[in-house]
Amino acid sequence: MGLSTAYSPAGSGLVPAPLARAARRRSVQVRRPRLATVRCSVVDAAKQVQDGVATAVGGGAASGNECFGVFCNIYDLKAEDKTKSWKKLVTIAVSGAAGMISNHLLFKLASGEVFGQDQPIALKLLGSERSFQALEGVRMELEDSLYPLLREVSIGIGPYEVFQDVDWALLIGAKPRGPGMERAALLDINGQIFADQGKALNAVASRNVKVLVVGNPCNTNALICLKNTPNIPAKNFHALTRLDENRAKCQIALKAGVFYDKVSNVTIWGNHSTTQVPDFLNAKIDGRPVKEIIQDTKWLEEEFTMTVQKRGGVLIQKWGRSSAASTAVSIVDAIKSLVTPTPEGEWFSTGVYTTGNPYGIAEDIVFSMPCRSKGDGDYELATDVSMDDFLWERIKKSEAELLAEKKCVAHLTGEGDAFCDLPEDTMLPGEN
């Protein structure tokens, strides 16, 4: 049932192979769309019930879209009572979509694990010319998985096409740090990627798009991205620090001898680097302060803190590669925290824009802080948090690092010439 395709890097798109051969015989030009689209349209449920038929979605040159296999049909949903409660289609863009993190994440998104079992989604996958064949493989696996909520899959290499009208942008793709590469050079190279993606989001995405930056250094990449999107609110941008929060919860649970779900209100403050601050002062175990349960202050201040900060490096030594599955899980957790009401008295960690924050943290950077959500995709900062000298001193150290990174990328944020002075290398090994 699938449609065979021929890929032309020069055209940056896909052309059905039979059409390409026919065009050569007739000496005519076949239009090459820049996006290859796999589509199973969500149509009005009431109309489907009334018509009771499955019809083909227009494809190829006639409609400007191409479909593959089962995604070419509009399906009869009259036997599905749940169709009446299905929500409006949510469109999600994922960059670095052919990578290991995405390989775990995309199937969680398609299954309904993230947005719910009544939420149809469309996936728009961004890659490069080099990864395009791998993207086709990802598309094929998604098709073969028969997810009923997955209504469209598009693959492409241009952010202006892939980001068109998206509701969520999960920016995973970034250049890895090569041997001997200075951290300042990595900031510049990846900063240019996120500046370009920010401009594309600003031009074509939904005005209320939610952006989660995963590619490292994610805090400063998120700052660069939001500075290049004047038409999108700065509060819509997040840097992923949920994996760090999950790691901290794990260590507290292991030390206390409880299950993970008993641990709450664990905040990661600051940068996604070894200057991050896992906050045990405000954390709770079964509603009680952690320091009442774990009375070993030396362990909390030293071993616990360093274990969380260096977890990524230890993992790559053991596993031989950086975390992928746990990163995908943390992306799921981060999104669910924004689309699900936060339980009363609890909060979660995410890197957000600091301007207007109540803690005294420097403004105009992206800094991980404790947040709550009403489940509408937005958030508010938690205000009922405690500070002591130990916590505040470490927060200021991470703040200083982010301010230094900001100076390194001033040329990408519209703030003049860059000046980079990063004497200490605090990148997370294997996660850069």
Swiss-Prot record:
It is an enzyme of class 1 (oxidoreductase). It catalyses: (S)-malate + NADP(+) = oxaloacetate + NADPH + H(+). NADP(+) binds at residues 96-102, 190, 214-216. Residues 1-40 form a transit peptide. GO terms for biological process: malate metabolic process. The keyword Repeat does not apply. Chloroplast NADP-MDH is activated upon illumination. In order to be enzymatically active, disulfide bridges on the protein must be reduced by thioredoxin which receives electrons from ferredoxin and the electron transport system of photosynthesis. It is found in: Plastid, Chloroplast. Belongs to the LDH/MDH superfamily. MDH type 2 family. Homodimer. This is Malate dehydrogenase [NADP] 2, chloroplastic. It comes from Sorghum bicolor (Sorghum).
